C-alpha cells in the first residue's frame, strides 16, 4: 500500500510540472506562487505520549518534498518518507521529531515513550566548565512524574550554593558550575506513582576556568660550561589544566643542537605540571646564548629565560674586597677578604705569609648556595697584629685549568725598635733602627753618665744614614757618626722616633790616660737599683698569688632569676634587692628549736628545726632553716636576703620548697622553708636501685600490694650523707600500700608533731616506672609554675629536687648551703663554678640563660631520673672534646628505664634551636598522657586541697617594676678558638 501511494504522488508531481511548462510557453501572463507554508504533522500536537511496545505513527503533509528528523540525546536519525512509523516503541524512541519541507520550514512534535522500567534516558559522562552552565542529560520518558530534580549519591546533600533548572525533554541544567563541584556524584530523581526513582550515577568533572597565565620557572637561571661538557636545564610549567602549550626557544633564532624531553602529570584535580627538559649533550662555544621557556594558555602567555655561557677553557678571576696595601696599628685586627670567580670549581686554596702556609685563621666558602654559583669568598682573619707580623700575605687558588693569586702588603704601624747599637772598629757609632712609618734618627751628647741627653749633635756630623725595607714590612734605618771628635767623658744618645713612638740607645765613654773606651750600660746599675727591682718583682708576684686565690673562691649568687623584660635573646632580670619584703613573714626567733645540720656549704648551712606556732598557735612543726656561717661576707648576706625576697615574690606551689617564714631583725637572717624528710631525689634514686621494679603495673588489687612488699630491706633518711632527717628509733612503722603511699603526708608536707608516728615512717616502698613518671610530671609542673612567674632556675638537676611524704617532689635552690667547691658536678669557669653537664649550649658558649635553657636542663634531669641517679654523659670529662661534641650535636642515648615516649621528650628538650624546644606547659601535657589515671587523680587531689600557710601573699597580677636590673655575672665558658 505504501508503494502504490508513492507512485501516485510521483504522477501528481509530473502532471504539475507539465502544466507549468505549458503555461510558460503560452502568451498568457505568468502567475507568481503564493507564500511558502509550513508542513502539517498528524497528530497535530506538540507532545505525544506513547506506551512502550505500542506503534508510533507520525505523518507529515506538504505539497512538496519533506524530511523527518529524530533527535534524542544529541543523536540524529533521518527519514525522507511522509510517515514515520515505529512498530514497537521503546524508551529510546523518546525525543523530538521534526518534519522539514524543501523550503526549510518545519514543524516538531516531542514524543514520550512511557516505560515504567526506564524513567530516564541517561547520557554519560558529565562534563562542565567552571563558570558556565552544564546539562545533566537525563530526559524523562514519562512527563507526568513529579519532583524532577537532582540528588546526591548515597544520600549526601548537594552543595548549598548549587542551583539547577529541570526540563523533562532535555534534562537538568546546573547553573554556574563551580570548581568545588568537581567529582560531585549525583542522580536525576523523580517521584513516580508514590515512589522515588533515581537515574544512573553521574560524576561531574569540572574543567577549571583559566584566569591566569601559566606559572613558569627554570631549575637554573644561568650556567657556565667548558666546551664538551653536557648541559641540561629543566623548565617547570604549572597550570590548572593540561590545556597549555609549552616549548623551548633560543633567542635571536640562533642554531643549536639542543634536544628536549617532556613529561607531565596531574597533582590533584586542578594542579597540572609539565616539565620541559632542554639537553645539549656536548656544548660548544656557539651554543652560548639565552634560552627561553615559553608557555601559553587561553588567558595569555608567560616565559622565563636561562643563560648559557660556554668557554673554551677554565678560568679564575680574583677581586680583592679592599686595597692590597693596608696600614694597621700594632695590636689591631684586620681581615683580608677576596672574592673570586672560578670555573671549574677551585680545587686548592691557601693563604701564605713569609713562605708559611696558614692552616687556620681563614675560611673559604661559596658566595651562594645556587648550583650554578661560580663566585667564592676567602677570608684571612689576622688578630692582634704585632709589629713583626707585617709584610706580604698572598692568597693562591687553583683549579684543573689555571692558577691565580693576589698579594696584600700589610704595614703595621710600630714605634721604632733599635736592633743594634755598637761601636765600629773604624771609629764610628752605629744605630740600626726598624719601625713603620720610617723612623727618624737623631744623635745627642751630654757629659757624664746620663740616661737622657739634651744637646743635639748637628746633622753635619752624621756620617751615614740610609734605609731599607724588611720582609716584615718595617723600614730599617742605619745611622752612624764619628766619635773621634769627642774629647771628654760623656754619653751619646741615639734617639729614633716616628708618629707612633720613640726609642733610645746610649753609648758611654771614659778616658783612661790618652785612650778612650766605651762603658757598657750595665755598669751604670747600682746594687741599690738592682735590689729595688727584685723587691718590686716579689711584691707583684705576691699580689698576683693573693688575687688568684681570691678569685678561686666560689662566689655565691642566687640561681633563681626573675625576668623583667625580654628583647630577643636579651633577658633583663629584676634586681632581687629591689623586690619588696613583707614583714608579715617575720617569725619570732625564740620559737625556733634547732636540731642537726642538714647541709652546709662555703658560706651557709641548712639546719633542721622545730617551729612552735607557725601554722597553729599550739602546734609544733618540723621546718628547714637556711642561715649564714660566721665567715660569710656582706655579699653573702645580701644574697640570702635576695633569696628570701625571691621566694616571697613567687608564692606557694605544691612542687617547690615553699617559704614559711623568716627572721630578719634582732640577729642574723634566717629563712624558714618546708622540711623534706627524704632528702634530695638524686640520692633517693640511688638508694632505690636494688628495689626498682621494671614493669609498670596498675595500682590496684593484691598484685600492687605484693609488689610493694617485695623489698624488705630497711632504709632510713639517715642512710646517706648530706640528706635530711634521721628518723627517731623506737617508733613503730606501718608500710602503706602503693595506693596509700602518696596519701601518707598531710597536705603540702606540713607535718605536725601530733601526727600518728605511722605516717612518719621512712619510705620503704619499692620504686617502679609509675614513680619515675610521677616525679617527672611533678617537676615539670613545678617548673611550669616558675616559668609562669617569669622565674629562671639555672641549676635544675636531681640534686636540687627534694622529696617528702607521699613522694611529692619539691624544686629548691641549695645555693650557699651546697659545698660546690667539693662537688665534681660544678666545674670552675672564670670566676664561678658551674654545672656544665646540665647546661644548654647557649648557656655554655654564650652565657645566655633563658626559659629554654631550663628546658634543656630538664631533659638532663629526665635522663638522671630514668637512669636511677647516674651521672649524665657517663665517663666523659668536661674538656674541649666535650664542648666540641655538644656543639656538633652529640646527645646521650636513652637511659635504661626510659619509655620511648619519655626519651622523645628528652630529645626535644635537647634541640640545638632553643625555639624548637617545648615549653614546660607542653611537657606537662605530654607526660599527662603517660601517667596512670590513679596517679593523676592523687596528684590533683593533693594540689587542690593543699592549703597555703597563713602568711602574706604577694599579688602577682601586676609585674613588679625594678628600680635596677642585673644580668648574670657568669662569664662565657668557652670562646670559639678553644674548641
Curated annotation (Swiss-Prot):
Report if keyword Cell inner membrane is assigned.
no
Q: Which cysteine pairs are covalently linked by disulfides here?
A: 60-99, 138-188, 153-185, 235-293, 431-494
The UniProt annotation places Mg(2+) binding at 571, 800, 813
User: So which residues have sugars stuck on them?
Assistant: 96, 132, 147, 286, 296, 303, 355, 370, 403, 466, 489
Query: What transmembrane ranges does the database entry give?
Result: 528-548
Q: Which InterPro entries match?
A: Ig-like_dom (IPR007110), Ig-like_dom_sf (IPR036179), Ig-like_fold (IPR013783), Ig_sub (IPR003599), Ig_sub2 (IPR003598), Immunoglobulin_dom (IPR013151), Kinase-like_dom_sf (IPR011009), Prot_kinase_dom (IPR000719)
UniProt xrefs under Pfam families: ig, PK_Tyr_Ser-Thr
List the protein's name.
Mast/stem cell growth factor receptor Kit
Q: Species name for this entry?
A: Canis lupus familiaris
Query: What does the record give as the organism's lineage?
Result: Eukaryota, Metazoa, Chordata, Craniata, Vertebrata
The encoding gene: KIT
Amino acid at each position: 500500500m505504501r508503494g502504490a501511494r508513492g507512485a501516485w504522488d510521483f504522477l501528481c508531481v509530473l502532471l504539475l510540472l507539465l502544466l507549468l511548462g505549458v503555461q510558460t510557453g503560452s502568451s498568457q501572463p505568468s502567475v507568481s506562487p503564493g507564500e511558502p507554508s509550513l508542513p502539517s504533522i498528524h497528530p497535530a500536537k506538540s507532545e505525544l505520549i506513547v506506551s512502550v511496545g505500542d506503534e508510533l505513527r507520525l505523518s507529515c503533509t506538504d505539497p512538496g518534498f519533506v524530511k523527518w528528523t529524530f533527535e534524542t540525546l544529541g543523536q540524529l536519525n533521518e527519514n525522507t518518507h511522509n510517515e514515520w512509523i515505529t512498530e514497537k516503541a521503546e524508551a529510546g524512541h523518546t525525543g523530538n521529531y521534526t518534519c522539514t519541507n524543501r523550503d526549510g520550514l518545519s514543524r516538531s512534535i516531542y514524543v514520550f515513550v512511557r516505560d515504567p522500567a526506564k524513567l530516564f534516558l541517561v547520557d554519560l559522562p558529565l562534563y562542565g566548565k567552571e563558570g558556565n552552565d552544564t546539562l545533566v542529560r537525563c530526559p524523562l520518558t514519562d512527563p507526568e512524574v513529579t519532583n524532577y530534580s537532582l540528588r546526591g549519591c548515597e544520600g549526601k546533600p548537594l552543595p548549598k550554593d548549587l542551583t539547577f533548572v529541570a526540563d523533562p525533554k532535555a534534562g537538568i541544567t546546573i547553573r554556574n558550575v563551580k570548581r568545588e563541584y568537581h567529582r560531585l556524584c549525583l542522580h536525576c530523581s523523580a517521584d513516580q506513582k508514590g515512589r522515588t526513582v533515581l537515574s544512573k550515577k553521574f560524576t561531574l568533572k569540572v574543567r577549571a576556568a583559566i584566569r591566569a597565565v601559566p606559572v613558569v620557572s627554570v631549575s637554573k637561571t644561568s650556567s657556565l660550561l667548558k666546551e664538551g661538557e653536557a648541559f641540561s636545564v629543566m623548565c617547570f610549567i604549572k597550570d590548572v589544566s593540561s590545556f597549555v602549550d609549552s616549548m623551548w626557544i633560543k633567542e635571536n633564532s640562533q642554531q643549536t643542537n639542543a634536544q628536549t624531553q617532556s613529561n607531565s602529570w596531574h597533582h590533584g584535580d586542578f594542579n597540572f605540571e609539565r616539565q620541559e627538559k632542554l639537553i645539549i649533550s656536548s656544548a660548544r662555544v656557539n651554543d652560548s646564548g639565552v634560552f627561553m621557556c615559553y608557555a601559553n594558555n587561553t588567558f595569555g602567555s608567560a616565559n622565563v629565560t636561562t643563560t648559557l655561557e660556554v668557554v673554551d677553557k677554565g678560568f679564575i678571576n680574583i677581586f680583592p674586597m679592599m686595597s692590597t696595601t693596608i696600614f694597621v696599628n700594632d695590636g689591631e685586627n684586620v681581615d683580608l677578604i677576596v672574592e673570586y670567580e672560578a670555573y671549574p670549581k677551585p680545587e686548592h686554596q691557601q693563604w701564605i705569609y713569609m713562605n708559611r702556609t696558614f692552616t687556620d685563621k681563614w675560611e673559604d666558602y661559596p658566595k651562594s648556595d645556587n648550583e650554578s654559583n661560580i663566585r667564592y669568598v676567602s677570608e684571612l682573619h689576622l688578630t692582634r697584629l704585632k709589629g713583626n707580623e707585617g709584610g706580604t700575605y698572598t692568597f693562591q687558588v687553583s683549579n684543573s685549568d689555571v692558577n691565580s693569586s693576589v698579594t696584600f702588603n700589610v704595614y703595621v704601624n710600630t714605634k721604632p725598635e733599635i736592633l743594634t747599637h755598637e761601636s765600629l772598629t773604624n771609629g764610628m757609632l752605629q744605630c740600626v733602627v726598624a719601625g713603620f712609618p720610617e723612623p727618624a734618627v737623631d744623635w745627642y751628647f751630654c757629659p757624664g753618665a746620663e740616661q737622657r741627653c739634651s744637646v743635639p749633635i748637628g746633622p753635619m756630623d752624621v756620617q751615614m744614614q740610609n734605609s731599607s725595607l724588611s720582609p716584615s714590612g718595617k723600614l730599617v734605618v742605619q745611622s752612624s757618626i764619628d766619635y773621634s771628635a769627642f774629647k771628654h767623658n760623656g754619653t751619646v744618645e741615639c734617639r729614633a722616633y716616628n708618629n707612633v713612638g720613640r726609642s733610645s740607645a746610649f753609648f758611654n765613654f771614659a778616658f783612661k790616660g790618652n785612650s778612650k773606651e766605651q762603658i757598657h750600660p750595665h755598669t751604670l746599675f747600682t746594687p741599690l737599683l738592682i735590689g729595688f727591682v727584685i723587691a718590686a718583682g716579689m711584691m707583684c708576684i705576691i699580689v698576683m698569688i693573693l688575687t688568684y686565690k681570691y678569685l678561686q673562691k666560689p662566689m655565691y649568687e642566687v640561681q633563681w632569676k626573675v625576668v623583667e623584660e625580654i628583647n630577643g635573646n636579651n633577658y633583663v632580670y629584676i634586681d632581687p634587692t629591689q623586690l619588696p619584703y613583707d614583714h608579715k613573714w617575720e617569725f619570732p626567733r625564740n620559737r625556733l628549736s634547732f636540731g642537726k645540720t642538714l647541709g652546709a656549704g662555703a658560706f651557709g648551712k641548712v639546719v633542721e628545726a622545730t617551729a612552735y606556732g607557725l601554722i597553729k598557735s599550739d602546734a609544733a612543726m618540723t621546718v628547714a632553716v637556711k642561715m649564714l656561717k660566721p665567715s660569710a661576707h656582706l655579699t653573702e648576706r645580701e644574697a640570702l636576703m635576695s633569696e628570701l625576697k625571691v621566694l616571697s615574690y613567687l608564692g606557694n606551689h605544691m612542687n617547690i620548697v615553699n617559704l614559711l617564714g623568716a627572721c630578719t631583725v634582732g640577729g642574723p637572717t634566717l629563712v624558714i622553708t618546708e622540711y623534706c624528710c627524704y632528702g634530695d631525689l638524686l640520692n633517693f634514686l640511688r638508694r632505690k636501685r636494688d628495689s626498682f621494679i621494671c614493669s609498670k603495673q596498675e595500682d590496684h588489687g593484691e598484685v600492687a600490694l605484693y609488689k610493694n612488699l617485695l623489698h624488705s630491706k630497711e632504709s632510713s633518711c639517715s642512710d646517706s650523707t648530706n640528706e635530711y632527717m634521721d628518723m627517731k628509733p623506737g617508733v613503730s612503722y606501718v608500710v602503706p600500700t602503693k595506693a596509700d603511699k602518696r596519701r601518707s603526708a598531710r597536705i603540702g608536707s606540713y607535718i605536725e608533731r601530733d601526727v600518728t608516728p605511722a605516717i612518719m615512717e621512712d619510705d620503704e616502698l619499692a620504686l617502679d616506672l609509675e614513680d619515675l613518671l610521677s616525679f617527672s610530671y611533678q617537676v615539670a609542673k613545678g617548673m611550669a609554675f616558675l616559668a609562669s612567674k617569669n622565674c629562671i632556675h639555672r641549676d635544675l638537676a636531681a640534686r636540687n629536687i627534694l622529696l617528702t611524704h607521699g613522694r611529692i617532689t619539691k624544686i629548691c635552690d641549695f645555693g650557699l648551703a651546697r659545698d660546690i667547691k667539693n662537688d665534681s658536678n660544678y666545674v670552675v669557669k672564670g670566676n664561678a663554678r658551674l654545672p656544665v653537664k646540665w647546661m644548654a649550649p647557649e648557656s655554655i658558649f654564650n652565657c645566655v640563660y633563658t626559659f629554654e635553657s631550663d628546658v634543656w636542663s630538664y631533659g638532663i634531669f629526665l635522663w638522671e631520673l630514668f637512669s636511677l641517679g647516674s651521672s649524665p654523659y657517663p665517663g666523659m670529662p668536661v674538656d674541649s672534646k666535650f664542648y666540641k661534641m655538644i656543639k656538633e650535636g652529640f646527645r646521650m642515648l636513652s637511659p635504661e628505664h626510659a619509655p620511648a615516649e619519655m626519651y622523645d621528650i628528652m630529645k626535644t628538650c635537647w634541640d640545638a634551636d632553643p625555639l624548637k624546644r617545648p615549653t614546660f606547659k607542653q611537657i606537662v601535657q605530654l607526660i599527662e598522657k603517660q601517667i596512670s589515671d590513679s596517679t593523676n587523680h592523687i596528684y590533683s587531689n593533693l594540689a587542690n586541697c593543699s592549703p597555703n600557710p597563713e602568711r602574706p601573699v604577694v599579688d602577682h597580677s601586676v609585674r613588679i617594676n625594678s628600680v635596677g636590673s642585673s644580668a648574670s655575672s657568669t662569664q662565657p665558658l668557652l670562646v670559639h678558638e678553644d674548641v
